[in-house]
């Protein structure tokens, strides 16, 4: 259906069936759609009974297509739902095509191809207009490999992501353009599909790769006796070999600018010693890993179908432990980075230049600039990241990532002001992500978000402010900051109200209440009288399960009962309780009394890690 609409020269607007009905209705109206395609009869029925499909001036659809009509004809569906617009099933539509001569339509690279509405934003979704030229750039220049590991005719890509998502959609276009086939899977059938269809390429979000990792390592951990010892030796030897190879190929992970600078400034003797050590480790570990591969890793690969030559991750940051594990197993895993507005890839790793922990380098005709958050000073620049055309300069400092290239959208549909804000004076699109161009490897590393938006491991976006506004209405909560970037779920740092806790089933004693209130600042602009006491008291609170559970239950209730109706992925799964408030004086709030999210996240990094446990 997607290809047919584009072939006809029309523009399609895609959205998942799980989207709220009011959102679907808004998108239909805002996009000026003239027809609609519904996956199921039930979806169409719910829309007709609910908000309906109505144009801005009350226009009805010219055509409704139902892909899975539950045995009904189009006429029967129209009669049952009481709608006076043409309704066709997919089979009926195909039959119409048999007797209709196709008229060729001239399409240019600047013509609108698809309209994608961003999710998880405050207010109404924004419609991203992507042209044929935007998508063609990705088809031509996005590569898995500089050599022979690209999909070829006869090979298979296993698809498990929503097909309307720009990442999955471009992956499918990429495979089809190379003559490869597609297998559509689901969470329920994924494990069977791996062994049944034995794909060559798997494209997914980090959450799925983490599920694979958990399943595989869980089985390995269940090994007994000699087998358990063999697994332990093989894992340690494999990781040692991976580290040695990374050192020798200059693929070391640099997690901070300071680490990269220190690496570059190493004395010659230290460099030589590091190289010698890596060569010795490589020589010792290689035969052990060769045997271990036959005993352990080959069986892991066979359990994943036995033919996987490339894993492609995108949608959010890939955890380093996943990078490490799949490299140990002997599977190539690469990462793409971008947004809906950039079609989506503006940086990617290729197998021959696969820097772990990074998102790689820009494809052809793409420029990346890293600017200082406050001054706008250029801290790093990348162009034509792969191959002979590489052009990179960097200070190694962290800033906001901007992108310019043929894959970047022209703008938002009916959103002139949003479009103006999204681009700088040089035509670079602001991603809202923080990162640095690593001076050692020349790769782009993501370090966080300049905007408040939280991107979960499954690729879903969460805007924290609307949720936080709901939570501070509770008498238990004075302040709250949501966290969860590149995690499975949302968690919350909750500055609790001592008085609120005391009023709720005596969660704290009158003596504690009096002591804690005396240690609190009178206002956000004044210093905290006794931060040490509050820190100790916070530890006490977090050590009381009944208190933590009471606050978490309150948080979940408020989100569940919120009139705006939050999505499943916007639910808070964990909380950490804090007594010392975020203030200007302790550096955790701006002069306009906004929480400095990056500063708070840094100060409470241990508490955040403890909420999530080991990744």
Predicted feature residues:
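Conserved C-terminal "lid"/linker of ANL adenylate-forming enzymes
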Residues: 479-483, 520-530, 556-615
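Conserved ATP-dependent adenylate/AMP-binding module captured primarily in the ANL superfamily
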Residues: 19-52, 138-157, 188-201, 303, ...
């Amino acid at each position: 259906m997607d290809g047919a609409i584009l072939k006809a020269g029309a523009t399609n607007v895609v959205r998942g069936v799980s989207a709220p009905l009011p959102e679907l209705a808004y998108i239909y109206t805002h996009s000026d759609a003239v027809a609609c395609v519904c996956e199921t009869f039930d979806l169409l029925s719910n829309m007709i009974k609910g908000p309906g499909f109505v144009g801005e001036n009350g226009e009805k659809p010219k055509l409704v297509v139902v892909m899975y009509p539950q045995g009904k004809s189009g006429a029967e569906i129209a009669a049952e739902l009481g709608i006076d617009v043409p309704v066709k099933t997919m089979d009926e539509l195909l039959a119409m095509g048999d007797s209709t001569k196709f008229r060729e339509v001239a399409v240019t690279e600047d013509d609108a191809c698809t309209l994608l509405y961003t999710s998880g934003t405050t207010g109404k979704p924004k419609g991203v207009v992507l042209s044929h030229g935007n998508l063609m750039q990705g088809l031509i220049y996005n590569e898995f490999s500089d050599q022979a590991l690209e999909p070829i005719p006869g090979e298979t890509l296993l698809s498990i992501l929503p097909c309307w998502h720009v990442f999955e959609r471009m992956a499918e276009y990429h495979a089809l353009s190379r003559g490869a086939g597609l297998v559509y899977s689901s969470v329920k059938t994924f494990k069977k599909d791996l062994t049944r269809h034995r794909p060559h390429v798997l494209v997914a979000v980090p959450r799925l790769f983490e599920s694979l990792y958990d399943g595989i390592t869980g089985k390995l951990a269940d090994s007994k006796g000699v087998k358990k010892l063999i697994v332990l030796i093989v894992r340690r030897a494999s990781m040692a070999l991976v580290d040695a190879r990374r050192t020798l190929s200059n693929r070391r992970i640099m997690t901070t600018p300071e680490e990269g600078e220190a690496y570059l400034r190493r004395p010659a003797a230290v460099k030589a010693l590091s190289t010698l050590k890596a060569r010795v480790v490589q020589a010792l570990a290689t035969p052990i890993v060769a045997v271990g591969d036959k005993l352990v890793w080959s069986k892991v690969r066979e359990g994943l179908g036995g033919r996987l030559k490339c894993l492609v991750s995108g949608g959010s940051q890939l955890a380093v432990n996943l990078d490490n594990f799949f490299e140990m197993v002997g599977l190539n895993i690469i990462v793409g980075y971008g947004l809906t507005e950039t079609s989506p890839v503006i940086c990617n790793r290729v197998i021959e230049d696969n820097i772990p922990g990074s998102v790689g380098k820009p494809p052809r005709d793409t420029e990346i600039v890293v600017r200082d958050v406050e001054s706008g000073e250029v801290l790093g620049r990348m162009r034509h990241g792969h191959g002979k055309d590489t052009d990179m300069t960097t200070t190694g400092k962290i800033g906001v990532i901007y992108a310019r290239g043929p894959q970047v959208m022209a703008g938002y549909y009916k959103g002139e002001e949003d479009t103006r804000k999204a681009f700088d004076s040089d035509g670079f699109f602001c991603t809202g992500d923080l990162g640095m161009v690593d001076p050692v490897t020349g790769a782009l590393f993501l370090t966080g978000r300049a905007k408040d938006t939280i991107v979960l491991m499954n690729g879903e976006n969460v805007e924290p402010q609307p949720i936080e506004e709901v939570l501070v209405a509770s008498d238990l909560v004075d302040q709250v900051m949501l966290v969860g970037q590149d995690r499975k779920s949302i968690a919350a740092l909750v500055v609790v109200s001592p008085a609120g806790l005391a009023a709720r089933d005596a969660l704290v004693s009158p003596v504690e209440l009096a002591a804690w209130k005396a240690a609190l600042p009178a206002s956000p602009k004044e210093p905290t009288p006794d931060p040490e006491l509050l820190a100790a008291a916070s530890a006490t609170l977090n050590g009381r399960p009944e208190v933590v559970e009471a606050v978490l239950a309150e948080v979940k209730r408020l989100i569940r009962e919120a009139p705006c109706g939050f999505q499943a992925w916007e639910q808070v799964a964990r909380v950490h309780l804090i007594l010392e408030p975020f203030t200007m004086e302790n550096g955790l709030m701006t002069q306009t009394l906004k929480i400095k999210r990056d500063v708070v996240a840094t100060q409470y990094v241990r508490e955040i890690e403890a909420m999530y446990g080991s990744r």
